Design a protein with these regions (language model features):
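Interaction/scaffold regions that mediate signaling and macromolecular assembly across diverse proteins
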Residues: 32-90, 94-98, 108-281
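Short alpha-helical segments used as structural interaction elements across diverse proteins
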Residues: 4-5, 24, 93
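A broad helix-preferring feature
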Residues: 18-24
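Short, intrinsically disordered low-complexity segments
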Residues: 6-7, 26, 59
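Surface-exposed, glycine/proline- and aromatic-rich loop segments on solvent-exposed faces
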Residues: 101
Length: 281
């Protein structure tokens, strides 16, 4: 019976293992850390590295300084990537929309930093066969998506948000693009932030204006590329001239010119887009 103590030890060890397994099976799964809908980490980075110009009508980015803060940026990107699709789906619409806008902007900065300072435009990151917005390299909601997916298949998807103001919130790292806001978009202030982004952009005469000599509106190419988004009836507006009418005071100076814009019966021309990097060198 010399091996009896050994057998007893094995039986006790086996029993302990079964008890531990049973406890593990009944213990609730560890909860995912609560997501910070204030996006405080992203705001901290933006406040350090974004230079607002002309009251926020435009902005430049200190990409060189951003590169020195790469660890903080990656920590924020990791927090975005850790959100499961089921969790995202359970959020409110403002929470989802703010998340996607911030994700687009933050991953765009990360994309620029992969080659900075050896580029003059985000387009330098593409090729003859594929634009820089097409590769599916962004880990988001449990899969790999492209920047185009975030913008066109999530934010612009019909029935999801149907809000043309998104075009004044996402930033493509280019001078022609609406300003990268110097703070994160947050759910509880999202409406006000989107309204302000639209006002800032429409106030920038270098990109949107009424040309009195030619008697026409001259606006950003964004309105040409995404004109359909301004015909969806958001806030009762179903055309680009009707949208521009809201900003008559920003687009024109003389009262008669403003009345023409408000009448929403003006011709529209689209300005060339400046794809140079929005770099504060």
């Amino acid at each position: 019976m010399a091996d009896a103590p050994v057998r007893r030890h094995l039986l006790l060890a086996g029993g302990s293992a079964l008890v531990l397994a049973a406890l593990a099976a009944t213990r609730p799964a560890l909860a995912q850390p609560a997501f910070d809908h204030a996006h405080a980490a992203w705001t901290a980075l933006l406040k350090k590295h974004v230079v607002a110009q002309r009251g926020g009508q435009a902005s430049q980015v200190r990409y060189g300084n951003f590169a020195a803060d790469r660890a903080a940026l990656k920590a924020y990107l990791d927090a975005l990537s850790a959100v499961p699709e089921a969790t995202f789906a359970a959020w409110s619409k403002p929470q989802r929309m703010a998340f996607l806008i911030n994700a687009y902007n933050a991953f765009t900065v990360e994309l620029i930093l992969t080659k900075y300072p050896k580029l003059e435009s985000i387009k330098d990151l593409g090729s003859v066969f594929q634009s820089p917005w097409k590769p599916k390299w962004v880990p988001l909601l449990g899969t790999k998506v492209s920047l185009d997916d975030i913008e066109h298949e999530m934010l612009r998807k019909r029935g999801a948000y149907d809000d043309p103001r998104v075009h004044f919130a996402v930033n493509c790292a280019s001078i022609g693009c609406p300003a990268l806001r110097e703070e994160a978009f947050v759910p509880d202030r999202l409406e006000a932030q989107l309204d302000e982004q639209a006002l800032r952009f429409m106030s920038d005469r270098s990109r949107n204006r009424f040309n009195a000599q030619r008697g026409r509106l001259e606006v950003s190419k964004i309105f040409d590329w995404f004109g359909e988004d301004f015909r969806l009836g958001h806030r009762g507006i179903a055309s680009l001239p009707a949208f521009a009418a809201k900003y008559a005071d920003q687009l024109a100076d003389a009262p008669a010119e403003r009345e023409k814009v408000r009448g929403a019966q003006v011709d529209v021309a689209f300005l060339d887009y400046d794809w140079k990097l929005n770099d504060a060198r």
